[in-house]
């Protein structure tokens, strides 16, 4: 279990804290979505969890031990831009480089590489120059490197935001399903409202504070929260929410398809 307790952080020469006494727990096998606007503290939280920054106040524990003593190699990070994380010429070289850095014996590497390439379906691309891979293939390549070293926590920082919706949705399902089978922790930093429905738990950050923690089933009860914090709700959902308030009905748990919302409105306005 990951335990974050009273975590605060202020950058040098900044007057105010970027994070203010953030506390939350994440159980093994749980997928936590962290959502908020730019400036909400999401990026700073990523840097603290990933070991790029040191907390000035508060603690981060994993399985009842401080994360610094456990080692940040327990965390696998998937960033927005895979080119930042891929340093070798080919995926095969990248995997060898990754495994060497984690002290894996050379005699064990071929088996691990074969296993992870099978999972991410890139066996036929392992010797292709990385620069010739598509953006989605590069993200899968980074994910292969993470799978190879078996992290306990997967930290995704806007990892799918540069992909088009079709590829993004397919890659999300693949990544989240794969991690779920391992019973590992996923922390998905996002500004995409649709990601919330893929999570087990959600925390909403605003101006460095944790405003609320809730389950995906409660999203429709939190629409005022999102609306009051000027969050861009999907238009069909926003329309349903506003109409529901006007006619004193509960916002329906609908898809984001406009036709579904229009049908619901017509039914209740008859």
Curated annotation (Swiss-Prot):
It comes from the Bacteria. Gene3D superfamilies: P-loop containing nucleotide triphosphate hydrolases. Keywords: ATP-binding, Nucleotide-binding, Transport. Disulfide bonds: none annotated. ATP binds at residues 36-43. GO terms for molecular function: ATP binding; ATP hydrolysis activity; ATPase-coupled transmembrane transporter activity. Pfam families: ABC_tran. Transmembrane segments: none annotated. InterPro entries: AAA+_ATPase, ABC_transporter-like_ATP-bd, ABC_transporter-like_CS, ABC_transpr_CbiO/EcfA_su, ECF_ABC_transporter_ATP-bd, P-loop_NTPase. GO terms for cellular component: ATP-binding cassette (ABC) transporter complex. Disruption phenotype: Probably essential, it was not disrupted in a global transposon mutagenesis study. Residues 1-232 form the ABC transporter domain. Belongs to the ABC transporter superfamily. PANTHER family: ENERGY-COUPLING FACTOR TRANSPORTER ATP-BINDING PROTEIN ECFA1 (PTHR43553:SF24), HEAVY METAL TRANSPORTER (PTHR43553). This is Putative ABC transporter ATP-binding protein MG304. It comes from Mycoplasma genitalium (strain ATCC 33530 / DSM 19775 / NCTC 10195 / G37).
């Amino acid at each position: 279990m990951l335990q974050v307790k009273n975590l605060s952080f202020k950058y040098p020469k900044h007057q105010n804290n970027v994070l203010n006494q953030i506390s939350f727990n994440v159980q093994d096998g749980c997928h936590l979505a962290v959502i908020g606007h730019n400036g909400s503290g999401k990026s700073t939280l990523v840097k603290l969890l990933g070991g790029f920054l040191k907390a000035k106040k508060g603690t981060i524990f994993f399985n009842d031990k401080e994360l610094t003593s456990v080692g940040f190699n327990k965390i696998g990070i998937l960033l927005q831009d895979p080119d930042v994380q891929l340093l070798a010429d080919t995926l095969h070289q990248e995997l060898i480089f990754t495994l060497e850095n984690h002290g894996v014996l050379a005699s064990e590497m071929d088996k691990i590489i074969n296993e992870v390439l099978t999972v991410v379906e890139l066996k036929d691309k392992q010797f292709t120059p990385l620069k010739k891979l598509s953006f989605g293939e590069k993200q899968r390549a980074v994910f292969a490197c993470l799978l190879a070293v078996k992290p306990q926590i997967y930290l995704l920082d806007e990892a799918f935001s540069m992909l088009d919706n079709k590829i993004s949705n397919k890659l999300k399902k693949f990544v989240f399903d794969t991690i779920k089978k391992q019973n590992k922790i996923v922390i998905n930093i996002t500004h995409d409202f649709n990601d919330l429905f893929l999570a087990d738990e959600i925390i909403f950050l605003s101006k460095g504070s944790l405003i609320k923690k809730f389950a995906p089933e409660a999203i429709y009860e939190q629409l005022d929260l999102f609306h009051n914090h000027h969050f861009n709700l999907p238009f069909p959902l926003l329309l349903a929410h506003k109409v529901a308030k006007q006619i004193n009905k509960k916002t329906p748990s609908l898809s984001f398809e406009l036709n579904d919302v229009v049908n619901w409105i017509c039914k209740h306005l008859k």
